[in-house]
């Protein structure tokens, strides 16, 4: 057994997907980019399919290829616009892609003409930038771009989409901004439809929009963070508590030392023992995703009790003040975060992220590859 493990509670994933589906009639496209936010894309996708998930979203062609190699046959949408080098792989693996420029259409059309498969096709979703400022065509270019897709042999229009910038905020100006984005998007959709074009899937809602902006559900939703157990902080605590963390990060006590009063611990001498105490050495550090910004202040759970991490977190290790008298032994399990329903302390990754001045997305994605993923089915 690896000393550092990310326990993936698939029952919690299924529970969260059930909660998501109870809140919308739209299809669910589950984001599994960044290895399913650190949870393991292939195993997560297989579990999600049994819950009725319609499709999956990835950030790049390589992620889509891994899903196909694992036997996932459901629709996959690549959220990044394609490069010339990637298009042949998109076509080969039957991956739909976002486009936002005429040049993307030309690249795909050329690749289709050069394909050895004379019947090859490529599904595309036209992305409209309604205020995010990233990938997407201007709203006044959307209809012409869709018409060009429909007129190009081998290309199939699969959807039209956008992305919200501040759907997780309840500030009045941000609520207005989200509604402005939604209205601009709907104007584009209506204009396209009036031109005689049918759009199979209209989609925009991320996790925050799913919970807070029901008028933005449309035909399909893309809830990532919710599926993995975390709702935006702006959501009412009663709603947030319904979603259960899927990942539990655990390690073990590798060594225990007694240190005298006045002794320093770790780099830069950031912590000094005020009295004689015991410290435990944990074989986990920032290379594993336990960010340096978490100390001081991070608490870990050992045997149902909380202990503070002290001193600077190192690349491969960190130190815990175990106090006196000593109630911990070498080899004891240590939980850094995880769901309470799994018998853990109930300290979620959102608590750690807030302490580190970041967001749960970043903390979950940062859990390193040398942390073994163990799937609890």
From Swiss-Prot:
The modification N6-(pyridoxal phosphate)lysine is found at residue 33. It catalyses: L-alanine = D-alanine. GO terms for molecular function: alanine racemase activity; pyridoxal phosphate binding. It holds the Pfam family Ala_racemase_C. GO terms for biological process: D-alanine biosynthetic process. One of its GO terms (cellular component) is cytosol. SUPFAM superfamilies: Alanine racemase C-terminal domain-like, PLP-binding barrel. HAMAP family: Ala_racemase (MF_01201). Belongs to the alanine racemase family. This is Alanine racemase. The gene is alr.
């Amino acid at each position: 057994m690896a000393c550092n493990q990310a326990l993936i509670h698939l029952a919690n994933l299924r529970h969260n997907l059930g909660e998501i589906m109870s809140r919308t009639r739209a299809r669910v496209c589950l984001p599994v980019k960044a290895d399913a936010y650190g949870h393991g894309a292939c195993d997560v996708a297989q579990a999600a399919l049994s819950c009725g998930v319609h499709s999956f979203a990835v950030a790049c062609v390589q992620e889509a290829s891994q899903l196909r190699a694992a036997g996932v046959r459901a629709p996959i949408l690549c959220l990044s616009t394609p490069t010339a080098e990637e298009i042949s792989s998109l076509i080969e693996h039957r991956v739909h892609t976002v486009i936002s420029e005429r040049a993307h259409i030309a690249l795909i059309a050329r690749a289709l003409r050069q394909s050895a498969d004379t019947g090859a096709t490529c599904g595309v979703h036209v992305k409209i930038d309604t205020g995010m400022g990233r990938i997407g065509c201007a709203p006044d270019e959307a209809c012409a771009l869709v018409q060009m897709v429909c007129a190009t042999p081998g290309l199939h229009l699969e959807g039209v989409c956008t992305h919200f910038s501040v759907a997780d905020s309840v500030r009045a100006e941000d609520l207005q901004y989200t509604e402005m984005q939604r209205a601009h998007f709907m104007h584009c959709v209506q204009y396209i439809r009036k031109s005689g074009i049918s759009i199979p899937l209209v989609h925009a809602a991320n996790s925050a929009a799913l919970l807070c902006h029901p008028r933005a559900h449309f035909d399909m939703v893309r809830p990532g963070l919710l599926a993995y157990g975390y709702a935006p902080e702006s959501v009412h605590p009663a709603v947030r508590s319904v979603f259960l963390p899927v990942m539990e990060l655990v390690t073990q006590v590798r060594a225990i030392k007694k240190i005298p009063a006045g002794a320093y611990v770790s780099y830069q001498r950031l912590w000094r023992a005020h009295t004689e105490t015991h410290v435990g050495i944990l074989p986990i550090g920032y290379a594993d995703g336990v960010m340096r910004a978490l100390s001081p202040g991070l608490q870990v759970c050992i045997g149902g009790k909380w202990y503070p991490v002290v001193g600077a977190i190192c690349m491969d290790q960190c130190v815990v003040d175990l106090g006196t008298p000593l109630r911990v032994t070498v080899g004891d399990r240590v939980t850094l975060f995880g769901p309470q329903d799994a018998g853990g302390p109930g300290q979620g990754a959102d608590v750690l992220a807030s302490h580190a001045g970041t967001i749960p997305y970043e903390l979950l994605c940062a859990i390193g590859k040398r942390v073994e993923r163990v799937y609890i089915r």
